[in-house]
Amino acid sequence: ADWNDALDMAAEHGESVAFTCAYAGNLEELAGLLRVLAERGHREVELLEELELLLEKENRLPDFLHLCAHSVRGSKRRFDTLALADTLQAMAERLREHIRKTEWIAGENEGWFNSYYDNHQNRVEGYFPGGVRMMLTGQVFAVMSGTATPAQTSLICRAADRYLYRKEVGGYRLNTDFHEEKFDLGRMFGFAYGEKENGAVFSHMSVMYANALYRRGFIREGYKALQSLAETAMDFETSRIYPGIPEYFNADGRGLYHYLTGAASWYILTFITQVFGVRGELGGLVIEPKLVREQFDGEGAAQISLHFAGKAYEITLQNPQRLDYGAYKIVSASCNGEPMQTDGVRVRVPAQDATENCILLTLGGRL
C-alpha cells in the first residue's frame, strides 16, 4: 500500500509507480535545498554514515535495509554539499526518464501514466478489451513531482476529464470501473464501484490533483477540481451533508465520513499556498496569486488573513478590471503603506517588525 491503503494485496511483486514519481520529486527538492545551503557557505553536510550505501551507483538497498533493520550506529560522516546535490539530482532524473519511457500510456489526443503493477507483475492501467483502466493517484504524483512534462500534463487532464470526471457526484473519481475483483492488487476491489477506494470521488486525492495542477501552472484545471468538490458538498439535496469536505462522495454523490479525511487540510493548504499563492520560501514570505476571475467579489477584490512567522497579515488583492488569470499581472504592491518590489508575477515580502500587517496587491493588464 502507498497513499491508497486499500491496495494491499501485491506485497510480493507489486510496484507503485505513483510513489516512485513522488520519490523523484523529493530527491530533486532535496538537491535544490542542498544547493541553497552551498550558496550560503555550507560546503559540507553531516549525515548518518549508513546513508552512504544509498548514494552508490549499484543497487545497495537490500544491504542498507539489512544494516538498519534494528538500529543505526549513530556515527556520522561529512559529505560535500554540491556533490551530494548532483547525486540526488541525477537519481531524480533517472527515475523520471525511466517512468516517462516505460509507464506512459498513449492514446489519441490523450494519455496518462500507469500507476501500479499487480502481484503478477502486470501493468494495471491502459486500454483493455473490457474497457479503459485509469487511476487518478499515479497522475497526481506524476504531475506534482514534475515527472509529467507540460505536454503530458495536458494530455493527462484530457484523459482524466474523459474517464474520471463526473460533475454530478463531486468531480474526479479515484479510478475507472475495472469490472473485476482484482485481489492480486488490493481489497479495494471488494467494494462496489463508486464506493470508498473503488471509484468514489475521494476528496483527498481530488484536492491533491488540484494542488499538483496549480503547482504546474494548469490553473483552470485545478480550479475545476476544487470547485467541483465545493459545489457538491454545498448541494444538500445531492450530498446530504452539512457543509464540509467528506472523505468521499459515493456513486450517488452522497458525502460520507467527514471525520476521516485529510482533504480539508489539503483544501485549505491549496487555497492559501496555491490559489492565493501565499507561502513561505526559504524563510521568507512570498505572494504569487493564481485566482481566476470568478474568485474575486463584485468589487473585484479577494482577501485572506493568516499568520506567518509569528506575525499577522491581512492580504488584499484588487482586480478592478475583473481580469482572469493569465490576463493580469501585479502592477503594484505595498505593505503597511510602504511600496514593495514585484516582477509582475510574485512579491517577496520583506521581514516586518509590526505584529499586525496589511498587504495590498493591485492587479492590472499584462499589456
What are these regions (language model features)?
Residues 1-367:
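Acidic, mature catalytic/reactive cores of soluble proteins
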